[in-house]
Each structure stands twice: as C-alpha cells, then as structure tokens.
Amino acid sequence: MSICPHIQQVFQNEKSKDGVLKTCNAARYILNHSVPKEKFLNTMKCGTCHEINSGATFMCLQCGFCGCWNHSHFLSHSKQIGHIFGINSNNGLLFCFKCEDYIGNIDLINDAILAKYWDDVCTKTMVPSMERRDGLSGLINMGSTCFMSSILQCLIHNPYFIRHSMSQIHSNNCKVRSPDKCFSCALDKIVHELYGALNTKQASSSSTSTNRQTGFIYLLTCAWKINQNLAGYSQQDAHEFWQFIINQIHQSYVLDLPNAKEVSRANNKQCECIVHTVFEGSLESSIVCPGCQNNSKTTIDPFLDLSLDIKDKKKLYECLDSFHKKEQLKDFNYHCGECNSTQDAIKQLGIHKLPSVLVLQLKRFEHLLNGSNRKLDDFIEFPTYLNMKNYCSTKEKDKHSENGKVPDIIYELIGIVSHKGTVNEGHYIAFCKISGGQWFKFNDSMVSSISQEEVLKEQAYLLFYTIRQVN
C-alpha cells in the first residue's frame, strides 16, 4: 500500500475530493450491508467474463463497472476508458491501476475522515436490522450422514454453483416446485438457508438453527427415495455421493425442459446444465504404434471427476504423471497398417478438454483379491495451485498455445474432503476456501477457521480445484 500521486492530483480540487470520498464511503457501506446473494451476483461478478471472483473483482470508482483481476478485465477497462481507480469488492480498499498498488492516502483509509463525507440522509434513514448469513453453517449429523454433508459443503461453497442457485435458473423452470419431492429444489433450499437474510424477529428466534436444517432434511428425504442404499446407518462413500448428487442435478435440468421425454443421456454433448458446462471435461485415449508412431485409434470420453492411484506415490503431481504416462499393451497383438508390423501397442491418456471445476479422487480404498477392502493411509502432498499443462492432449495444448508455446494452466484449490478412520468405521470432514482466501473446517454441525498450512497437511480423499488463469 503506497501514497498514490494520481489520487493526490484529484484531491487538489476540493469538489473532486468530496466526490471520491463520498463514493468510496457509499461503496463500502453497500459491501458491508449487502446480502451475499447481491454481492455474488453484482459486486463480485466480472462484467466481461461473468465469473465470480470473490476478493479479486474491482468496482470502477468512476462508472460502476465490475471487472476481474485474474483475466485482466478491469485493466482492459482502465486502458480503454481511462478509469484508473477500482474498489476491491471484498475489502473495500481503493486500488490504482497506474501505480499497480492499493492507495494508502490517509483520507481513504481513515474511517473517521470518511465518516465526515457521508450524506446526512443516512442519519435519518431507518434500515431494518438484518442478520446476514455467510454460508458458514454446519449440517447436523442425522445418523452417518457425514458423507453427504462433506460433499454438500464443498458444493455450496463453490462460486459457480452458488451463482447458479442464486440465479434461480432451476426454481424458475421447475415443474415440481417442492423441496421434499425435487432434489434440486432441496439444494436451492439449503443455499437459501445458508446465504439468505434473516430479519430481526427471525434472528432472535430460538428455532433459527433448526430452520436452517430444513433444506438438508428435504434433501435426505429425496435422496433416500431415489436410492434406498443411501438410507440407514451404514458407512457410505463420499465419492459415490458426489457422483449421485451431480447426476440428480442433471436429471432435474432434463425434467425442467419442455421436451423432457425426448431428452436422453446421449444428448449430454449439447446439455447446458451446470454439471456439463462447469464440471465436465473429456479424456483422449490414444493407441500408438511404437515403431512408426502412427496414431491408429483415438477415443474421446467425458468425465466429471478423475480417479487417481496413490499407491507408492507421495505427491499429487506423481499421481497425475502415473495417470498420464504411456502404457505398453502386452499381448494385445496390435497390427499397424501404416508400417505393416505386429507388436505391443502404446496407450496414453490425455485431457482432451479441461473443466472449469476439476474434481480429483485419490483412490484410498483398495479391493483385495480375497474380497476384503483396505484403506491406504498414505499422505499425498497436494498444491494450492495446480498446473495441468503437462496432462493435456495435443489438441487441448494447441487450443491454449500462442506462437507454439504452451502456457501454464493454473487451477486453485477451493475444497477438500478428507476421511478419518478405517474402511468400515470412518468419518468425513470438509474444508472449504471462501472469499478473502480464508479456509474453514466443516465437521458435521461444527464450523471453525483453519490455516492453509493445516489444510495442506490433511489426508485428502477428494480435491476440488477451480480454473484460475491460463498464462
């Protein structure tokens, strides 16, 4: 944070100074008193790419445009229009895009000075007292439901899903409109309970915490009706529930369509639901002749998460290297029509299309030949920022390359599900990163802040990464 000569130049004119300070104070008031829904959809959403970048979006001081930092959309706005001052939508600080630093001028960081420039109307206007919900609420364990609540926490703290739910895309088109009968309605109910606003009467009510669990109860009811194996007190797998929940979100979308009966799973390539537009990627499997390097067969298959072997591995990058490495197909009797030879072929997997949200499963549960199962407790080191450049197929690399150079493709860690215990007796806990970069631990109904250093020490089972930049 530094003293900005550009804002000092503006302050030389008393009228301009008054305007800047009043605008800054008004913006901070809006940021501090807006319900999360409004912040997500307005002040935290980039006006160019429409991505929600909590903590990395700036509101233009001169025209109100919101632009992100990650894709340089506010910088582009600044260069094109000449507006150089932006207010960070998360912390309310003013940033100068010419100085490339936050402004440390005392008039802009001293609340006492700013208060002098607040319009008199504020002292005469009554604003209803509201308790703002920020999503930081646990989910009560209703009998071995930790596998559900851990997945739900990672989902409802995903900015893409929050934007989708708060846009009311499903509720505006749902033909059922009942959270106890529609899975997506139940999810929307949970989001409303965790991010919506309470009035004074509701905030003081003793039933408030119970009311916040209504959506979760509805979701349990729907899930048990759809799949009875999810009911009861037996140990369940969080990864299987992740696959179940995204399938139900897709099915709800299909049912909302006017021609729902004509839509089938075969049409997923054209599906515009959040599952297939945000979470779906595709894998390219190639069979290559080791003699002449002829690529004789290539198949493209979709994926919603990647399962990685962790045995004898220490780092996530080692797991990805193993997933991507070339494999010799022994006893395959592969005949190459190009060089007219028969030999063992080479098979390799590469990512044909990367999703916006990349979900990775670390395969901790192993099925043994004697029919029993065991858990692999190996610690796998995983990064906060993951570079997926080396694991893409040639086509995906070419799509991002400039002048023949393949750029880094960076994903940011935003969620973790860890498993404590054994195969038969265990417990799931979620860790989620919210706006401002703060991590929180969700252990059923208990929520607590946790440092990033502690998060990176966890025995991860599922990792949720979101695309951040290609550079």
From Swiss-Prot:
This enzyme's EC code(s): 3.4.19.12
Effect in UniProt of substituting H77A: Lowers histone H2B deubiquitination activity
Binding locations of Zn(2+) 6: C289, C292, C336, C339
Result of altering C46A: Lowers histone H2B deubiquitination activity
Pfam families: UCH, zf-UBP
Subcellular location as annotated: Nucleus
Binding-site residues for Zn(2+) 1, renumbered to this chain: C4, H6, C96, C99
Residue sites binding Zn(2+) 3 per the record: C60, C63, H77, H83
Keyword Transcription regulation among UniProt keywords: yes
SMART domains, per the entry: ZnF_UBP (SM00290)
Domain (USP) ranges: 137-468
Keywords tagged on the record: Hydrolase, Metal-binding, Nucleus, Protease, Thiol protease, Transcription, Transcription regulation, Ubl conjugation pathway, Zinc, Zinc-finger
MF-aspect GO terms: cysteine-type deubiquitinase activity; molecular adaptor activity; zinc ion binding
Enzyme active site: C146 (nucleophile), H427 (proton acceptor)
Catalytic activity: Thiol-dependent hydrolysis of ester, thioester, amide, peptide and isopeptide bonds formed by the C-terminal Gly of ubiquitin (a 76-residue protein attached to proteins as an intracellular targeting signal)
GO biological process, one term: RNA splicing
Residues that, per the record, bind Zn(2+) 2: C46, C49, C68, H73
Sequence positions that bind Zn(2+) 4: H170, C174, C182, C185
Extra remark beyond the main annotation: Present with 1030 molecules/cell in log phase SD medium.
Subunit structure: Component of the 1.8 MDa SAGA (Spt-Ada-Gcn5 acetyltransferase) complex, which is composed of 19 subunits TRA1, SPT7, TAF5, NGG1/ADA3, SGF73, SPT20/ADA5, SPT8, TAF12, TAF6, HFI1/ADA1, UBP8, GCN5, ADA2, SPT3, SGF29, TAF10, TAF9, SGF11 and SUS1.
Free-text comment on this protein's domains from its UniProt entry: The UBP-type zinc finger domain is required for the interaction with the SAGA complex. The USP domain is the catalytic domain, but it is only active when in complex with the other DUB module subunits.
Family: Belongs to the peptidase C19 family. UBP8 subfamily.
Its biological purpose: Histone deubiquitinating enzyme component of the transcription coactivator SAGA complex. SAGA acts as a general cofactor required for essentially all RNA polymerase II transcription. At the promoters, SAGA is required for transcription pre-initiation complex (PIC) recruitment.
Protein name: Ubiquitin carboxyl-terminal hydrolase 8
Underlying gene: UBP8
